């Protein structure tokens, strides 16, 4: 029996689900992680990542709110939207990225609110408010110069937060915001109705980014939300940028998306009296090093895991996990069936190869980067 177990172990090891190890804090971005208390009937702590420019401040503050991946929120990684982080650090902002209750290492349980999408956003916004209450008590925070940003479910959270009209928060930025609820009848209409309700109570302007090949929200869905929001008196400028890659939902996290959103955001920030231009003295925060991204190939469609060479069922399952990770990301494979992936900066390409090569005998090559396939047959 021991021999059989050892043989099985060897067979499994050749295709180990090799995810890159959890990242160390990036000292070049002054990255730290705090556990911020949220008071209530029971006090819970919210895992929050902080990035600050060097110096004592006070700095303008931006909160960046995360989305919701499929599956158990507790297994969701700590959100590190480094493209956005670098953009704001170069402009002198302190960047605060909270994980809401039930997500990652935050305590408490995720409260979905069933099919009541309006209530869902309000509950999420309550967690963000608790973090901002803590932040505004810190000497490094400029309480008069604050911005709320969010992507996907975080964008919806941002719109809900707008109803609080929190002192010092000058504007809202919504990247592909919403919450897809296929189990709920007419959930798209529910989003529009809730957006209109939020607008009635919100006094600050907002900037919205949506694309036409979004895997969560189609064109009619986001147009309906925007029409309801502005029709109810909300101030919302929509940037409808068309198609982006294989899924426009990934715009905010993709380096290729920066040229679409950064110029629009800079103009918007200046229009509401917030810092918008990068400072030359802070240029170091914008530098990204790492492997060059290979060119896209036509070997296979991104989501067609049946075409991936070498890997067994565990590798195909790992690839499905990889596809749910935020951009930037990379997936690597080897002829012996080994595989590995990594997401987030720094350099997910190198880290995915390193993860794969733990069992890949230095023969690993990249199969996919971000939202395209780069594999070439020999």
Regions found by a protein language model. Give the residues of each.
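N-terminal cap/lid segment of alpha/beta-hydrolase-fold proteins
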Residues: 21-56
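Short beta-strand element of the alpha/beta-hydrolase
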Residues: 58-67
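Cap/lid segment of the alpha/beta-hydrolase catalytic domain
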Residues: 69-81, 87, 97-123
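Secreted/extracellular ectodomain signature
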Residues: 103, 279-378
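Alpha/beta-hydrolase active-site loop
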Residues: 116-139
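Alpha/beta-hydrolase fold nucleophile elbow
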Residues: 140-151
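The feature captures the conserved acid-bearing segment of alpha/beta-hydrolase catalytic domains
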Residues: 171, 177-237
